[in-house]
Curated annotation (Swiss-Prot):
Annotated binding of Zn(2+) 1, by residue: 920, 923, 932, 935
Protein's name according to its UniProt entry: GATOR2 complex protein WDR59
Lineage: Eukaryota, Metazoa, Chordata, Craniata, Vertebrata
Composition bias type Basic and acidic residues, residue spans: 344-373, 853-869
Segments of this protein annotated with the region Disordered: 343-373, 849-870
PROSITE patterns xrefs: RWD, WD_REPEATS_1, WD_REPEATS_2, WD_REPEATS_REGION
Cellular-component GO terms for this entry: cytosol; GATOR2 complex; lysosomal membrane
Residues that, per the record, bind Zn(2+) 3: 956, 984, 986
Record's subcellular location: Lysosome membrane
Length: 992
């Protein structure tokens, strides 16, 4: 270590430190240099007398280090290394690690101690999270802020204890720690990554950002669309921070080819040239901070650390400080005299957070006169930073591309002349700005010749302009551009009303006028006739999916409403014409970035030949800056437009009655129903579903072997007919009304429970278990091979939905394509009522069964009555299983899905007999001949030409569809599937 003194600075060299970060404590006594092996503590009062070391064992460099800014905690500092933060304690010449903060999953990019609360520390990381820690409880962060992109910078507000700012690539977000769910404000600050962010020391709304895009920008987050001022540079800016005195700013550039390693001191109110340059470092300046001002001294010291391994302390005397406060220092007396006339500051989004400053005493005013760069002077200056500092700057930043407006500005005379052309009218106005503008002093407006509007219109325009200007200047905001836009909008509105009234005094008022001759207007001639019914572009939507997720999208974060929330949103393209008058703007963008879009707001930029349509509703916003850097000019045209909102996937499985864990634990053992119910009850207990434990316990009792039905129907009534049999099970499904949402109403159900809960998981599992319990021995499903009753079985096919023979249990034919019917029937067709009042599924789904032997019918009825599941509701039970199988598929439980779908009933192929009996396709009555004697309709209808078939015809024996022989032959020369679209492969099933 060596020390060199000069009149300007102190240089201390640390040859082997390899430090990557530096910080100065709040007392101005010590600086810490963070190396990979050691932390070096330097006494700034005697830097040449040596330094102390704190050893550390880590393979990661320290990314950020900072002392606690509070005097009572001045011996604490924090250092980030990879994914953790170490809290060090330095006292009595020795240091140690107090505790470690661990929570981030990626590298920590920045940290910052709270200005008002000594126990709070905020950290930002690439993992998209910003954590606020309380060092009294370091187990987990007290507040977590989440963003889509990782944060590179985080800084607490120096005036508001609840606000902080973070940078994400080129964007800045303002957060309120009391509302961590979303950011208070979003700013699209730069086109490239932001390297530095710093709050103004005397204004809670102002901050500066430095970026890779070769610029430093000054912002007021109350006006997120436009920066207050900009400092253009030739190279990227590494850091930009405010000085503790006056209105200064220090910047460090990213050197190109190691040529520029100086620090520049700027006057923030005059950015034409730096007021001082700190030259001396031979390599990149990594960090710089200010020492606390010593008692009795007006000098400040700037401490810098560079990659050349030198620590330098630069003295900033009173004369240099005056360079950063030029115009304010000259008007100190005027400021003191007019301090009582200053308007109240604008309310922040949370007025209760503002700390009201006490009034000044006479002694304090004397101190201000003696020492101009005081906090009150800076506060006055910071109030002015909310807007362009001078009228000339406002003139330079104004958007002169307002249609039909010409503005002649004279900054020296503090006035401007505005000329507006609208239809056949011309308005010329002189606007004069007082010396106090915009500090609660509104400009004056005066119409001058030539002005062609009436006196009544003049009075209305003057009132509107005065109201608009007063609203702005009360908040110390500039008002020229808002007044110009208001002038144009109102004038166009008056002219439109005048034209519509004079063109036809007996016609009804029309809100959309014909094109004006002087400039492009939007008419009702839309792109096409159907455009009038095109809905307005959707800004949000939501959908649930079967896997337990909610997928929704919102409007882009870069857009917000320009009107009150009560303003209706246009629902069609024709309603959009109301916005073309310029009186209302549906949306406006939050940023001036050229790559962004904003919604059309009554300022058409297209020619008269172009028509309005939904596709032309969005357009690129015109650049408002008069100049741009070379980088922006070359890349902005090719940069992709990003105006879409975010698509968010939310896990809502906790709100659903189905559980993935239950799907994994449930079993279906067809060989032991008792074991299945017992194990499923245990699984329900594991996930905390006590109601399901009771259900499965009841199922265990109901499936006991001692309750099994007898084979002889005369011995006893089956247990399923007992009140605790089928009726108890149906009480779990739901009543008639509640089950309509799940499918057809269940017969005999009395209580509404699991269908009301939409618990398809429990419904499907119970159906599968009791289906397995009630299956006849050796029969795979209740619709197994039919007994050989070809002589007396009637299987009627109709145009109603029926299963096909494609091998899939879920493939069904479309009822709309069936044009004819057929049956394989016996000679006798009689219907005998059931003694139990039951109807079989075959009767409901496949036609009517006729028995020649009453005992055979009685046995079949007994088989139905001994089932715990009502065969009449088989279709609904199958729907439960298919729905649950779809959920299992989305969960990735394919084996469990296959087990459940095994219990879906598959209807058998229809019996193919020899005799043919014809049923009418309209009234379903038996027909002899080509015409029905009951309804007088034709029996057959060709599936190709849809004309009644009288002569030669051919029909498929599987699906029953057909038609004229010539038509069928022509169709199946090139096709293989039935022409009705039922999916039947007729050529494979029968021969034509």
């Amino acid at each position: 270590m060596a020390a060199r003194w000069s009149s300007e600075n102190v240089v201390v060299e640390f040859r082997d430190s390899q430090a990557t970060a530096m910080s100065v404590d709040c007392l101005g006594q010590h600086a810490v240099l963070s190396g990979r092996r050691f932390l070096y503590i330097v006494n700034l009062d005697a830097p040449f007398e040596g330094h102390r070391k704190i050893s550390r064992q880590s393979k990661w460099d320290i990314g950020a280090v900072q002392w606690n800014p509070h005097d009572s905690f001045a011996h604490y500092f924090a250092a980030s290394s990879n994914q953790r933060v170490d809290l060090y304690k330095w006292k009595d010449g020795s240091g140690e690690v107090g505790t470690t903060l661990q929570g981030h999953t990626r590298v920590i990019s920045d940290l910052d101690w709270a200005v008002f609360e000594p126990d709070l520390l905020v950290t930002s990381s690439v993992d998209t999270y910003i954590y606020i820690w309380d060092i009294k409880d370091t187990r987990k962060p007290t507040v977590a802020l989440s963003a889509v992109a990782g944060a590179s910078q985080v800084k607490w507000n120096k005036k508001n204890a609840n606000y902080l700012a973070t940078s994400h690539d080129g964007d800045v977000r303002i957060w309120d720690k009391r509302k961590p769910s979303t950011a208070v404000e979003y700013l699209a600050a730069h086109l490239s990554k932001i390297h530095g962010l710093d709050w103004h020391p005397d204004s809670e709304h102002i901050f500066a950002t430095s970026s890779q895009d070769n610029s430093v920008k000054f912002w007021d987050y109350r006006q997120p669309r436009k920066y207050l001022n900009i400092l253009p540079c030739q190279v990227p800016v590494w850091k930009a921070r405010y000085t503790p005195f006056s209105n200064g700013l220090v910047t460090v550039m990213v050197p190109q080819l190691r040529r520029e390693n100086s620090l520049l001191l700027w006057n923030a109110s005059d950015l034409n040239a730096p007021v001082h340059t700190f030259v001396g470092h031979d390599d990149v300046v990594l960090e710089f901070q200010w020492r606390r001002q010593k008692e009795g001294s007006k000098d400040y010291q700037l401490v810098t650390w560079s990659r050349d391994q030198t620590l330098r302390m630069w003295r900033v005397d009173y004369q240099m400080q005056r360079l950063c406060a030029n115009d304010i220092l000259d008007g100190v007396d005027e400021f003191i005299e007019s301090i009582s006339l200053l308007p109240e500051p604008e309310k922040t989004p949370h007025p209760q957070d503002i700390d009201h400053q006490p009034s000044l005493s006479h002694g304090e005013e004397d101190a201000i006169k003696e020492d101009p760069p005081s906090s009150l002077l800076e506060e006055k200056r910071s109030d002015q930073l909310g807007l362009p500092q001078t009228l000339q700057q406002e003139f330079s930043l104004i958007n002169v591309q307002i249609r039909n407006v010409n503005v002649e500005m004279d900054a020296a005379d503090r006035s401007c002349t505005v000329s507006v052309h609208c239809s056949n009218h011309r308005v010329k106005m002189l606007v004069t700005f007082p010396a106090q503008y915009p500090n609660n002093a509104a400009p004056s407006f005066q119409f001058i010749n030539p002005t062609t509007i009436t006196s009544a219109v003049k009075a209305k325009l003057l009132k509107i302009l005065k109201d608009t200007s007063l609203q702005k200047v009360k908040r110390n905001q500039s008002c020229l551009e808002p007044c110009l836009r208001q002038l144009v909008s109102c004038l166009e509105s008056f002219v439109n009303q005048e034209d519509s009234a004079s063109s036809n005094p007996f016609a009804l008022q029309n809100s959309v006028t014909p094109p004006l001759p002087t400039f492009a207007r939007v008419t009702t001639a839309y792109g096409s006739y159907q455009d009038a019914n095109i809905p307005f572009p959707r800004t949000s939507g939501a959908r649930f999916c079967g896997a337990g997720y909610l997928v929704y999208f919102t409007r882009p974060m870069t857009m917000h409403r320009a009107v009150s929330p009560t303003e209706p949103t246009p629902r069609s393209l024709s309603a959009l014409s109301a916005y073309h008058t310029g009186l209302i703007a549906p949306m406006k963008i939050r940023t001036e970035a050229p790559g962004n879009l904003r919604l059309y707001s009554g300022s058409p930029t297209r020619s008269e030949k172009e028509q309005v349509s939904i596709s032309s509703f969005y357009y690129k916003e015109r650049k408002s800056r008069r100049w741009k850097s070379k980088r922006e000019g070359s890349d902005s045209g090719n940069r992709p437009i990003k105006a879409a909102g975010k698509v968010i996937i939310q896990d809502v499985s906790c709100l659903l009655p189905v559980h993935k864990s239950l799907g994994e634990l449930y079993i279906l053992n067809v060989n032991d129903t008792q074991e299945t119910c017992q194990k499923n009850a245990t699984s329900a207990m594991l996930v905390g579903r006590k109601d399901l434990v009771q259900v499965w316990s009841l199922a265990t009792v109901a499936t006991d072997l001692c309750l099994g039905p007898k084979s002889d129907p005369d011995l006893e009534t089956p247990w399923a007919r007992h009140p605790f049999g089928r009726q108890l099970l149906e009480s779990l499904w739901g009543d008639r009304e509640s089950t309509r949402v799940c499918g057809p109403p269940l017969s005999g159900a009395r209580l509404a429970h699991y269908c009301q809960l939409r618990d398809v998981q429990t419904l499907a599992m119970l159906c599968s278990v009791f289906e397995a319990q009630s299956r006849p021995q050796g029969l795979p499903n209740p619709f197994g091979p039919f007994p050989n009753r070809s002589s007396n079985l009637v299987v009627s096919h109709s145009r109603y939905p029926s299963f096909t023979s494609s091998g899939s249990c879920s493939s069904m034919s479309d009822p709309g394509f069936n044009t004819g019917g057929w049956n394989i029937a016996g000679r006798e067709t009689e219907h005998i009522s059931s003694p139990w009042g039951e109807s079989s599924p075959e009767e409901l789904r496949f036609g009517s069964l006729t028995y020649s032997d009453p005992r055979e019918r009685e046995r079949d009825q007994h088989d139905k009555n001994k089932r715990l599941l009502d065969p009449a509701n088989t279709q609904q039970f199958d729907d439960f299983k298919k729905c649950y199988g779809e959920i299992l598929y989305r969960w990735g439980l394919r084996e469990k899905r296959a087990e459940v779908l095994k219990f879906v009933s598959c209807p058998p192929d229809p019996h193919k007999g020899i005799e043919f009996g014809v049923y009418c396709s309209h009234c379903r009555s038996e027909v002899r001949g080509t015409q029905c004697a009951i309804c007088k309709g034709f029996t057959f209808q060709c599936a190709i030409c849809h004309v009644a078939v009288r002569g030669s015809s051919n029909f498929c024996l599987t699906c029953g569809h057909g038609g004229h022989t010539s038509h069928m032959m022509e169709w199946f020369r090139t096709q293989e599937v039935c022409p009705t679209g039922c999916g039947c492969h007729c050529l494979l099933e029968s021969t034509f």
